[in-house]
A protein has these predicted regions:
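Conserved acetyl-CoA-binding loop-helix of GNAT-fold acetyltransferases
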Residues: 85, 91-104
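A conserved beta-turn-beta hairpin within the catalytic core of GNAT-like acetyltransferases
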Residues: 69-80, 90, 136
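Acetyl-CoA-dependent GNAT
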Residues: 10-14, 18-21, 25-75
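Conserved GNAT acetyl-CoA-binding A-motif
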Residues: 106-118
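Conserved catalytic-core motifs of GNAT/GCN5-like acyltransferases
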Residues: 115-117, 121-123, 127, 132-146
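Conserved N-terminal entry element of GNAT/NAT acetyltransferase domains
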Residues: 1-14, 146
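Residue-level recognition of the GNAT/N-acetyltransferase active site
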Residues: 12, 86, 90, 119
Length: 146
């Protein structure tokens, strides 16, 4: 596989048929019963969401998003979500390129920082791509839906 064959672009409605199964590789949530039209409309309504797909030979092999948060103090911050690369494409720098694309979006939107949450086994991957842990910083989550 040649690196230049991966094309990154903004996610489109038609991509959901491939993005949802890809997300299944990331989490145990069952996306098969979700109404893709409703999901797409909710995604579009949130104009702070910026999702992109990576295409290889016309097939979606990667997905990621960066949510832009406008701060009251006049700055913007980005939060990376749902980074996933198809199992068949892992180890081929697709994830590295996906992160670079999302960082560029953050720069274009004027973000002063980007944060992300990841599982411990992925920590070194993100550190190699410029992210750092912050001492004494702990992520807390409150799930409102199962």
């Amino acid at each position: 596989m040649n690196k230049e064959k991966i094309e990154f672009r903004k996610v489109e409605r038609k991509d959901l048929e491939e993005v949802f199964p890809l997300l299944q590789q990331l989490t145990e949530i069952d996306y098969s019963s979700r109404n893709k039209g409703v999901c797409w409309n909710l995604f579009l309504e949130n104009n702070s969401s910026n999702g992109i797909v990576g295409l290889y030979e016309g097939k979606v092999v990667a997905y990621g998003a960066i949510v832009i948060e406008n701060k009251i103090r006049g700055e913007s911050a980005g939060h990376i979500e749902d980074i996933v690369v198809d199992k068949s494409m892992r180890g081929k720098n697709v994830g590295v390129d996906l992160i670079k694309e999302l960082v560029e979006i953050a720069k274009e939107k004027g973000c002063y920082r980007i944060t992300l949450n990841c599982d411990e086994p992925l920590l070194n991957f993100y550190k190699k791509n410029g992210f750092a842990t912050k001492e004494n910083e702990i992520t807390l989550k409150l799930y409102l839906k199962k």
